Amino acid sequence: MHPKKLLNAKQISTILYRLSYQLIEDHNDFSDTVIIAIQPRGIILAKRIIEILNNEYSDIKFGLLDVTFFRDDFRRTEKVLKANETKLDFSIENKTVVLIDDVLYTGRSIRAALDAIQSYGRPKAVQLLNLIDRRFSRELPIQPDYCGIHVDSRLNQKVKVCWRENDGEDSVYLFKNKE
């Protein structure tokens, strides 16, 4: 199976605007909402969303969350893990936290993020925004509140989100794991 392009740059842009306006509808002026990107794959998506939101709201609190050592599988590898930066320069106490990650697959990264976020306070609510929801691959009962598209895929397939900042183009591909 050759890689199948699921989304091109124009489609991704349209989805990002839709997701941003859904956030605006639900969170008004963002005074009680913080946006947190899950390291590393959620950063570019979150920054793109923030860029759109900043056209109307300039004081949105934005942070980065590393979940490396909160994952339930981090001890199952021989290689040394490298943690990413967690940067939360604000309180999440009694705020609505919108977690952002590129692909929701098994739900394990989100479970780890929920554990990690508790170290920083008790949010009023936690919501999830994903560009891609691989909905039939879930191992945990986790669903996105905001979703770009649903992708039905097999276990031997992988979804890759490409960003122009890292990969030279905005696109999403579906391919077999070995490709």
Walk through the language-model features, giving the residues of each.
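Short, glycine/charge-rich flexible loops or terminal/linker lids adjacent to PRPP-binding catalytic cores
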Residues: 59-96
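PRPP-dependent phosphoribosyltransferase catalytic core
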Residues: 115-179
